[in-house]
């Protein structure tokens, strides 16, 4: 049963990566930008939830909703202040700005909450289930995380395909200039994309901290990077690709820790990225883009 247990844990961890990767893939697919500060929004979401529960005594569900709202606002503010002026700038300028925003959020959290790691109280009180006569136990956090990932991916897919806002996102992703000529509010659409991505980061942050109950100003850094790897793995810009890439990456990481070495697990994850880029640079669901001259 140990292999099945590792597999389930890998799917759970991969579900968190998938939710984070959705933020990367949406922003890149629509705004054609890589928001490398996305991982730190995870940390902000965790701290908002932590503070709401410990200092304000809020119910866990209310604290999670507050966290999602706070990160939604944060995402829009970051887009307006940091990224909107750089839409016509070089990718290097956007990258440098993203790193600057990341350091700003980390140091702001360091100033407010200090460097000590906080013990995060899980927002999920469900104990989980036992299978195979008690030989296989699946925690409540694992079940909720996997279910949340499925619901988010399905909901986001339906939102994009069946709502006017979603159709506007598709139009902007295809041709921003043509979308603007058709009367679509490009600025509002891009801001909405950042808002949704940041709200998802908040949810991912809460799930991550519930599974691994610790929180500090750098909590989101490595999960953010791994989620970017997952987005590239699945094909950045593709929602199904983000989900598949995240889950595969989570399984690879957990199995590497279990059967190879916990110290080498991160190296193996990044080695997978290198192999994918060599074999299929566009990722599993990525499409080749032909430049017309």
State the predicted function of each range.
Residues 1-20, 48, 60-63, 89-94, ...:
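Membrane-interfacial amphipathic/re-entrant helices at transmembrane-helix boundaries
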Residues 15, 24-46, 60, 88-93, ...:
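Short, non-helical or kinked segments that cap or interrupt transmembrane helices
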Residues 13, 135-215, 239-245:
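Helix-loop-helix "hairpin" substructures at the membrane interface of multi-pass membrane proteins
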């Amino acid at each position: 049963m140990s292999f099945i247990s590792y597999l389930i844990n890998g799917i759970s961890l991969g579900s968190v990566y998938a939710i984070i990767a959705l933020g990367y893939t949406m922003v890149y697919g629509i705004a054609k930008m890589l928001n490398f500060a996305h991982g730190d929004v995870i940390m902000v979401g965790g701290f908002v939830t932590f503070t709401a529960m410990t200092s304000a005594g809020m119910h866990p569900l209310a604290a999670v909703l507050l966290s999602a709202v706070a990160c939604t606002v944060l995402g829009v503010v970051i887009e307006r202040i940091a990224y909107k002026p750089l839409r016509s700038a070089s990718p290097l300028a956007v990258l440098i700005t993203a790193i600057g925003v990341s350091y700003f959020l980390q140091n702001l959290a360091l100033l407010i909450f200090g460097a000590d790691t906080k013990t995060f109280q899980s927002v999920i009180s469900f104990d989980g289930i036992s299978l195979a006569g008690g030989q296989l136990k699946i925690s409540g956090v694992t079940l909720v995380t996997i279910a949340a990932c499925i619901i988010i991916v399905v909901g986001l897919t339906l939102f994009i395909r069946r709502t006017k806002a979603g159709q506007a996102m598709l139009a902007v992703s295809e041709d921003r200039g043509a979308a603007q000529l058709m009367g679509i509010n490009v600025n509002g659409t891009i801001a909405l994309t950042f808002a949704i991505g940041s709200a998802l980061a908040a949810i991912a942050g809460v799930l991550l901290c519930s599974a691994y109950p610790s929180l500090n100003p750098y909590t989101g850094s490595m999960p953010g990077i791994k989620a970017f790897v997952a987005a590239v793995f699945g094909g950045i810009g593709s929602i199904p690709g983000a989900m598949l890439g995240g889950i595969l990456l989570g399984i690879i990481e957990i199995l590497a820790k279990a059967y190879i070495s916990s110290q080498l697990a991160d190296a193996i994850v990044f080695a997978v990225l290198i192999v994918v880029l060599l074999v299929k640079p566009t990722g599993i669901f990525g499409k080749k883009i032909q430049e017309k001259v």
